[in-house]
Amino acid sequence: MHYPMFSHAPEPADQQHQHNGEERTAALCVESTLEPHEAWAALTEYIHLWWPRQLLQSEESHIDLSTELLLEETADGDIIPVARIIQCENEDVLTIAPYPGTRLGRLLGVVEESEESLSFILDALTPETAEGPLSLLEISSGTYTGREDEELGIYEEQEEAAALLMGAYSRFIGAELQKEEL
């Protein structure tokens, strides 16, 4: 917490705008004709059907989302925590913080003393035509706060993992991953 009346207190680092001196380099999103509740169910309830195999310990592993953790169950029955759930607001936002040593954590460059996170943000859209998109899922580095002026996007070093996750999700729902350079 930052208290500006204490002049000796250091200014807080703004994680939303920069990450290790880097700026957000890409915006990744998926527009879908699914209703928002269906897009949310695909993201959360059916995560085991789309989660990238490259991020699992083995082909036989099963991924599951609990209230506090993203878990992987191996073919041997071992349960491996993949990420901590930072926030999960139904049909709105899911933020995960991968653990170091997991495949996702290694791909994101997570180290013990840092807390890297990714937020999946769902927006309901008003379609311009009957066939128009009804929902939009974006992925953003860091923890989404919902501020109007909040900068969204992915840091360059997290782009590979974000594209892998969003690409798998988009294929599962029959949509296309969209990328915009920032």
Language-model features, listed with the residues they occupy:
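Hydrophobic ligand-binding cavity/cleft-lining segments
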Residues: 1-62
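Generic short beta-strand segments
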Residues: 6-10, 46, 97-103, 140-144
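Hydrophobic pocket/interface hotspot
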Residues: 39-43, 85, 96, 137-139, ...
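Short, surface-exposed coil-to-beta transition loops
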Residues: 25-27, 78-83, 113-119
